[in-house]
Structure formats: C-alpha cells, structure tokens
Amino acid sequence: MQYNLTRIDPDAPNEQYPIGQRETVSDPLEDQVHKNIFMGKLEDVLSGAVNWGRKNSLWPYNFGLSCCYVEMTTAFTAPHDIARFGAEVIRASPRQADFMVIAGTCFIKMAPIIQRLYEQMLEPKWVISMGSCANSGGMYDIYSVVQGVDKFLPVDVYVPGCPPRPEAFLQGLMLLQESIGQERRPLSWVVGDQGVYRADMPSQKEQRREQRIAVTNLRSPDEV
C-alpha cells in the first residue's frame, strides 16, 4: 500500500496551508522490518496499539455551519448511537477535540475562523468534510462561498450528500477510523521519523464503480 508522507516545511509562507511537503512513499514499517526485524515488529505492535486507542476514542469538536450540522447532531441521538464508535464526547473547545466536521456552507468570511479553530487543535487531528457545500461549494457557485474546504484545510474524509443522512456521517466516521488504523505517526517528538504517513485510501465511488455499472434492473422513480 502506498502512503502519503507529509513533513513540516518551516520555510513555507504563512498563507500556504497546510504547511508541509508531500510525497508518495511505501509503508515505513515494512522498511523498518527489512532493516531490523525485531525493532520493526516491536514498532509495528506499538503503532498498532496507539492507533487502536486513537481511532476508538475520537472526540468531535462541536462546530457547524449550516443544515448539514443538523444531520450530524442527529447521529448523536439514541436511534443512531454514535457512542458505539467512541465518538460521543462532544468538546466545546478545539484544544480538547480530536477531529472537526465541516458541516455546511463555508463562506469566505468564515474561512479564516475555521482555519484558526483548526490550528488550535492539538496533534493528532483530523477533518471530515460533510455535505456538497463543504466538499465543493455545492450549488453556491458564487464569489462568497469557498469552493471546497480543502482549499485551506487538509481533509481526511469526504461525505457526499445535500444534506447527507446520519448514516452517511457514521460511514464517514468509520472510514476515518480505518484510515487512522493504518497511519504511521511518530510515537514521540524525539523518537522516530517526525513525518506523518497516511495511507492512500481509495474512494468508495471508485470501489463500487463496477458494481454499480453492472446493475441492469433499474427501478422507476416511483419505487425509489
């Protein structure tokens, strides 16, 4: 599996975001095993244990922009029970949160505030872009709306829909957990490579492309 390596670039200008240099590399743990099998296996076990704890205890930041936020909060109700995934502890401060959900329309005036909130979150941190407006601007192709929050934030998971159902948000959360389980992060600021290795995860659209094309018994609009 290919990984995307991101390193901090101290010489980057302040307006560049995310600040870092990216390149496609192989799994660093496999390279470590080839060099020293004992240390490589030990690092693999430690990394797996740390990632397991991170992905099963994700604290979301209580933040919303538009109607998609209503669908996100619905996922916290009893019928959906987001507590099954360990993500029910909503934080009122970005300094205590693990991930942020950009749910709704992001206006240009709001972009600096969102970026400031993201910068206040401590590492490791992740971003879920929820809804068509957050993903690409949606139907608001106008001067006042940012055409996708990935213009100024590093997005980990995109949840399509206008607005997405709570089930779609839960699937996005599970995809984020899967991605976190395969991440390679430094165990300490003084131990190991300080770069962040993220697995190159294929999109669900591409994974199900052949399955959807093979469908021939299409239902009428009255039956959907």
Swiss-Prot record:
Binding residues annotated for [4Fe-4S] cluster, in chain numbering: C67, C68, C133, C162
Cofactor note: Binds 1 [4Fe-4S] cluster.
GO cellular component: plasma membrane; respiratory chain complex I
Membrane topology according to the record: Peripheral membrane protein
EC number: 7.1.1.-
PANTHER family linked: NADH DEHYDROGENASE (PTHR11995), NADH DEHYDROGENASE [UBIQUINONE] IRON-SULFUR PROTEIN 7, MITOCHONDRIAL (PTHR11995:SF14)
Protein name (record): NADH-quinone oxidoreductase subunit B
Record organism: Pseudomonas fluorescens (strain Pf0-1)
Name of the gene encoding the protein in the UniProt record: nuoB
